[in-house]
Amino acid sequence: MDFLWTWLPFLLVSILAQFILAPIIVRFTSSHPACPEFEAAGIGQLPPDVAANLGRFVYAMNAEGFVLVGYFRQLAYMRNVGFYLALLKHPVHADTVYAMEMFANNGIVPVRSAHVEFCTDFTDGKEICTNNSKQPSVHKAHPGMRVHRFPEAQNPHLLYAIHRRLCANLAPGVAHVPMADGMEVFHLSYGTVKDVRKQAEFGYYYLDEKGNVFRPTLKGACRITWRLAWPIGAMRRSRMRKNARATMLSLGF
């Protein structure tokens, strides 16, 4: 009983911080640009470690038939958040892929993360995306965009094979829509904010026209923070890994 009373205050503070204070902070400080702008950059303009990582990725994807569109950077996508990425497209299969290195500075410890995502648009208006992000989405799923996460598929060749198999199984016989030449930067900008626009239709974000940014509603802020908070976040990550393994097995991997 003494043990319980010792730890009870810490538990209550944790619950208060994660489920009450965090949504309020996110509600009033978080934003997504409504029209994000991406700056093209040469590989020599990237930080050396980022350039090395993205360069290896481009070389690996060249072997799969992808061609490089370019390297891009967005150093102020959200408050204290920016990223670098390499964008490629497949001239035959009409697939696109990007490798992203994201960084965030919360004022205490700089945070870095990276993931790869393959995307295919179809003539019926749907989109299938396959990535290896280690974090489950905090957004509401919608039928127009099917996003599959395989956090243990860190080999880009394996991830692309999974993506191709998913496209064949989920959209058999439906033609792919290629990324138009000269529209790559627009496609990148629109694709970045497309899901946020959809979330706004669900009531999780609203457009702040003065700042030209999307901001979370209180409902959206609660959804974002609660789905990441412990122990919910840990359970969702565990379930995501389990589902990913089951899907890979069903696809023959």
Predicted regions and their residues:
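Extended, charged low-complexity segments
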Residues: 217-253
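N-terminal topogenic membrane-targeting module
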Residues: 21-86
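Structured extramembrane domains adjacent to transmembrane segments
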Residues: 58-211
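Feature marks short, highly hydrophobic, charge-poor N-terminal signal-anchor/signal peptide-like helices
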Residues: 1-11
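Short intrinsically disordered, low-complexity coil segments enriched in acidic
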Residues: 12, 190-193, 225-232
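Hydrophobic membrane-insertion alpha-helices, especially the h-region
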Residues: 9-20
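Terminus-proximal functional modules
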Residues: 24-40, 185-190, 201-216, 221-222, ...
